[in-house]
């Protein structure tokens, strides 16, 4: 695993070094058929990371949000697989907010090899094999896709946040800054895979489509409903507030 940990660190450095070029493309916006934004920064960063990985991982099967085609392979195969969302939370990003992230998950066949979450403008990252500083919270984070379950969850009381970035939510539920993260409408593999694998590594309770998640590959051709709870009982001296 050690060489791959080094590779993930190098990807983080690659993104950090590219940040000025990414930010320079922030407000060059186009609109997808579903009405969501995509910026030149999304395209630039996906192309940069894909090229860098292809030079280092032989016969790589690359799955990226901005380049994935519906006719492409959707099941894991022998060899290296990379699943990337170059800028998760594009609406935040192109609005000038700093709560956006990079999500990368690497697999060898059906076996997870390592994952990385980055919050580049906030200067933070989380990756496979690295320790995390755990905190505690009573906040539930919700996805920004409006769904009746979100409205009822907020109406039922308690602290709730809609933060507009799956990477930010996944990063924070893994370390305990969110007690729970819920996306009842569903998100794509590139939005979720790195984050759910890191949450799995750190002992969170994870439900995908209503079933316990055991760390399997998520196909890129469909959406997944996710519910993650931080396990405060697994680290001493911590517990949910309230």
Where are these predicted regions, by residue range?
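N-terminal subdomain of lithium-sensitive/metallo-dependent phosphomonoesterases centered on the IMPase/IPPase/PAP
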Residues: 1-87
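DPxDG-like acidic metal-binding loop motif
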Residues: 75-129
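Conserved residues at the C-terminal ends of beta-strands
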Residues: 65, 118, 184
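Buried hydrophobic positions in well-ordered alpha/beta secondary-structure cores of metabolic enzymes
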Residues: 19, 89-90, 173, 199
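Generic detector of well-ordered alpha-helical packing
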Residues: 43, 66, 86-89, 120, ...
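An extended, acidic
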Residues: 135-242
